[in-house]
């Protein structure tokens, strides 16, 4: 039984990589990340990079976000974003296609923290309870899969809205419920 986010994310990523290996004989590939440096890159092709996950290289977690906003984030979100470097991964959950957000490099980690700060500032301004995004919905520009910072639940939220739907009781369970999708 998988009991922590780091293990659950590692297990899912392994399944994702295995699916790509089975379908193509190569690691996962991305056109969006072409030209963006990362230790994950195993080879570069014609406007495409192939990647494999790498250990997260920094000691710090999301401390900059916590200090900037005087907030304590759920331990699960720290583990989600600081256990590995990888490309974003296409997944399905209950028939919906999502893009699971990952950290690609140390520079990307800085951008992620800036985006989380912006997300949390917007929520505070709109008097919404704090969340940290983990995925985007491919079918809905405003739909975001997030971790509720108060309860630790995984939710679907409409950006800037009070509309929220609980998807899973915790991040470990959610990572165990999503399925990898092969998309070129």
Curated annotation (Swiss-Prot):
Species assigned in the record: Photorhabdus laumondii subsp. laumondii (strain DSM 15139 / CIP 105565 / TT01)
Principal subcellular localization: membrane
GO CC terms in record: cytoplasmic side of plasma membrane
Name of the protein described by the UniProt record: Protein Syd
Protein purpose: Interacts with the SecY protein in vivo. May bind preferentially to an uncomplexed state of SecY, thus functioning either as a chelating agent for excess SecY in the cell or as a regulatory factor that negatively controls the translocase function.
UniProt gene name: syd
Pfam family, any one: Syd
InterPro entries for the chain: Syd, Syd_sf
Family statement: Belongs to the Syd family.
Record's bilayer topology term: Peripheral membrane protein
NCBIfam families: PRK04968.1
Lineage of the species this protein comes from: Bacteria, Pseudomonadati, Pseudomonadota, Gammaproteobacteria, Enterobacterales
Superkingdom of this protein's organism: Bacteria
Gene3D superfamilies the record matches: Syd protein
Keywords, ordered alphabetically: Cell inner membrane, Cell membrane, Membrane
Location of the protein in the cell: Cell inner membrane
């Amino acid at each position: 039984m998988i009991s922590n986010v780091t293990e659950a994310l590692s297990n899912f990523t392994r399944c994702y990589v295995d699916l790509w290996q089975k379908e193509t004989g190569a690691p996962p590939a991305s056109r969006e990340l072409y030209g963006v440096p990362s230790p994950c890159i195993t080879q570069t092709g014609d406007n495409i990079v192939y990647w494999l996950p790498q250990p997260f290289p920094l000691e710090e977690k999301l401390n900059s976000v916590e200090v900037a906003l005087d907030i304590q984030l759920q331990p699960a979100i720290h583990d989600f974003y600081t256990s590995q470097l990888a490309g974003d991964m296409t997944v399905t959950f209950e028939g919906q296609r999502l893009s699971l957000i990952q950290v690609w490099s140390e520079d990307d980690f800085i951008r992620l923290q800036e985006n989380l700060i912006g997300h949390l500032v917007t929520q505070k301004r709109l008097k919404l309870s704090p969340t940290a995004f983990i995925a985007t919905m491919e079918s809905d520009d405003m739909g975001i899969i997030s971790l509720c910072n108060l309860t630790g639940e995984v939710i679907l939220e409409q950006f800037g809205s009070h509309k929220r739907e609980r998807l899973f009781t915790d991040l470990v369970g959610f990572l165990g419920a999503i399925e990898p999708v092969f998309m070129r």
